[in-house]
A protein has these predicted regions:
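Charged, glycine/proline-rich intrinsically disordered loops and linkers
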Residues: 191-205, 279-319, 445-473
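Long, structured ligand/cofactor-binding scaffold of large enzymes
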Residues: 40-139, 151-162
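Conserved glycine-rich FAD pyrophosphate-binding loop
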Residues: 2-11, 44-50, 75, 80-82, ...
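Conserved oxyanion/phosphate-binding beta-strand-loop segments in alpha/beta enzyme cores
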Residues: 20-41
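Short, conserved charged micro-motifs
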Residues: 62-65, 128, 249-254, 334-345, ...
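A conserved active-site cap/scaffold subdomain adjacent to cofactor or substrate pockets
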Residues: 245-248, 317-356
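FAD-binding subdomain of flavoenzyme oxidoreductases
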Residues: 109-111, 122, 127-264, 268, ...
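Flexible, glycine/charged-enriched surface loops at secondary-structure junctions
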Residues: 28-34, 141-144, 253-284, 293, ...
Length: 539
């Protein structure tokens, strides 16, 4: 980490505010280096206005001190976790902004296997939480995104998230019992049964109005999460896997919904032919392959893990051959008989389709190594990817899929001319709906100058670029067109950030209510301004 320097001149925040923050946290906890401030003001989609400073608290009290100081000085504050936003979630919109890096609040505070909950700080990564719980033979129902090596609990709760465990248990919000929140004036509060005045326990969410839900998916616009209480389930004793391929997208989409409605699969996700080809062409070294097989063996106990690792090794990458859609399923159960019964039921459900069963290499590998460190030097390339997600009820998934394909077909010439590629993944999310997620890929040397390994931006190199390239602008326009189609189909979204039109698509009574709440908890509109569309509200 670059050294802190209060003498390093940065615009936007008066020196006495910086001095007060340094007094509250220590000088080494306030970063003003330009390369760091620009980096922390850039997410996976774009750059915001560079923050005046980065503050790194280590406790809830220190978060409260930051927010109090900034509120008194009319300075904006933006929370940041692992930095995996791709919708402008933590990007400042004005120079008078302090970014609050919450990753030092990273402790697993209590694992209560009697009452089946865990108390964890918001800056803890999903991988760290998973490993701590696994040692106690428990797990959270939803247990993280694939980016959970660096993505934090607080980031997922603020922006919304689904993947591991989500086909059976729903998105992350459905696994939350309570949260600890710091409001704009520095006040700390707790929700659910944890918010009682005497002998409070966080075991129950639904005591009175659901105050926990109010602060989930809020993008940090209503409060900064410092702790969360999540449900626990016994760590699955038995896991089975299935993979199928389809020639037709309509059949694959219908299969995602058929599996999702049953609610018996931990994960259910389908890759289109683009992603199947990516997996087939993936160039890995022998050492990386051995690590993957070791992960599969380690991820399941005893002979079952060794057997599945051997199956994966024998199948190799041949399972990724062909112009096909690939459906991948993980199945958890307390007993081998139960896991086998679930597996048999899913085979029966898909028997009447054009599904062809193949070796389940992909879901085995995912569960064997569930969290990937994306921020490594060997993964640093100029190739970017930008997801766009839309969650719809099962009854609307096929129509949304067709309209998304029309957008991509209409843009095919532009994409070919500029080297832009796009693949689509489908996810089952709970029993009521599914997600369609196109990912756009293109080459962007400018964005490469934001180094996610060193966590600094190359200021000199960035100065040599005259704004975003034409290719980047076209990619962003395609994303807007995809989003517009999703909105037309009534989609919900995770990672709302400053991209999806949440407020603009709410009915007037909801917009008025959220405006009143925002003005109560953040009367000056200084908490992550612009997120949720709340910058459009009068304060």
């Amino acid at each position: 980490m670059p050294s802190s320097s209060s003498s390093n001149s940065r615009p936007g925040v008066p020196p006495d505010v910086i001095a007060a923050l340094e007094d509250a946290l220590g000088r080494d906890r306030i970063e003003r280096n330009e390369a760091s401030c620009v980096f922390f003001s850039t997410d996976l989609s774009r750059s915001g206005v560079a923050a005046a400073a980065i503050a790194r608290p280590g406790t809830t009290d220190e978060v409260g001190a930051i927010l109090r100081i900034c509120a008194q000085a009319q300075v904006s504050v933006v929370p940041r976790g692992g930095g995996f936003s791709y919708t402008g979630g933590y990007l400042p919109i004005n120079e008078s902004t302090i970014i609050v890096d919450l990753r030092d609040l990273n402790h697993v505070i209590e694992i209560n296997t009697e009452d089946m909950y865990v108390v964890v700080e918001a800056g803890c990564t999903w991988e760290r939480l998973y490993e701590a719980l696994k040692s106690e033979n428990v797990r959270t129902p939803y247990f993280g995104p694939m980016s959970g090596f660096g993505a934090t609990v607080g980031g997922a709760l603020s922006q919304g998230s689904f993947f591991l465990g989500s086909s059976q248990y729903g998105p992350v919000a459905d696994s939350v019992l309570a949260v600890e929140i710091v409001l704009a004036d520095g006040t700390t509060m707790r929700t659910g049964s944890w918010g009682g005045v005497d002998n409070a326990s966080p075991f129950y969410r639904s005591y009175g109005p659901d105050m926990t839900g109010l602060f989930l998916g809020d993008t940090g616009a209503l409060g900064f999460k410092t702790k969360a209480v999540l449900k626990l389930v016994p760590f699955p004793r038995h896991t089975q896997f299935l993979s199928f391929v389809f020639d037709r997208e309509e059949a694959a989409v219908a299969a995602v919904s058929a599996v999702g409605r049953l609610g018996i699969a931990g994960e259910c996700y389908c890759w289109d032919p683009y992603f199947v080809k990516v997996m087939a062409a993936q160039s890995t070294s022998l050492m990386q392959d051995l690590k993957l097989l070791a992960g599969v063996a380690r991820g399941q106990k005893g002979s079952r893990g060794l057997f599945n690792a051997a199956r994966l090794a024998i199948a190799g990458k041949s399972v990724f051959d062909g112009e096909v859609f690939m459906l991948n399923i993980s199945i958890d159960d307390p007993t081998a008989e139960g896991a086998n019964a679930r597996q048999a039921l899913l085979r029966d459900v898909l028997a009447g389709t054009d599904a062809r069963e193949i070796t389940p290499s992909a879901p085995m590998a995912t569960r064997g190594t569930p969290f990937i460190n994306f921020n490594t030097s060997e993964r640093r390339t100029t190739m970017r990817n930008l997801p766009t997600n839309g969650l719809v009820p099962h009854s609307r998934l096929a129509a949304l899929s067709r309209d998304i394909r029309l957008v991509l077909a209409n843009r095919a010439d532009d994409m070919a001319r500029h080297g832009i590629e796009c693949g689509v993944i489908y996810f089952g999310v709970g029993q009521q709906g599914a997600c369609l997620e196109p990912l756009i890929y293109w080459d962007d040397p400018r964005h490469f100058q934001h180094d996610r390994v060193a966590e600094v931006s190359n200021i000199d190199a960035l100065a040599g670029f005259d704004g975003p390239s034409e290719t980047t602008e076209i990619a962003m326009q395609i994303r807007k067109e995809l989003t517009a189609v999703m909105v037309r189909h009534g989609s919900a979204h995770v990672q709302i950030g400053k991209t999806y039109p949440w407020l603009a698509t709410r009915t007037p009574p909801i917009a008025a209510l959220i405006g009143a709440i925002k003005r109560h908890v953040d009367p000056d509109g200084r908490m992550n301004p612009g997120s949720l569309g709340l910058a459009d509200l009068p304060v």
